[in-house]
């Protein structure tokens, strides 16, 4: 949306993501990313850690379930999202304001690690347009994937090998 402040942060999860469900059944995962800048000190010839930035993040629907299944405390991640300010009142009646990241995209950082990515397929209905549901298999069977095999001969409905566009 126009006017939103977009941020990308690279850091480590401080704890396992916490997965919850709204009364309407939408999944939401909450987690904190700690990002610590490193600077090279030429006088000492050593790398020094700067002051850590801790950002509270939330992600919704199917992506929330994927995060909860895939990421754990200490995972190095790349997060892109929008900064949102939220005000609330504590049980003691104190007014508080927090700034959080509403996550659009998240993935593991491959700078110091490797990852195997599996396309998630979830069964069941759900809200939000992402088709979120309860569980399901992590990877669909090849027979269910129309793009999982080479096209049959003559699939472009012509005798030549040219595509129809």
From Swiss-Prot:
A Gene Ontology BP annotation from the UniProt entry: DNA replication
GO cellular-component term (any): nucleoid
Location of the region described as Disordered in the Swiss-Prot/TrEMBL record: 117-165
A Pfam family it matches: SSB
Tree of life domain: Bacteria
Keywords: DNA-binding
SUPFAM superfamilies tied to this protein: Nucleic acid-binding proteins
Name of the featured protein: Single-stranded DNA-binding protein
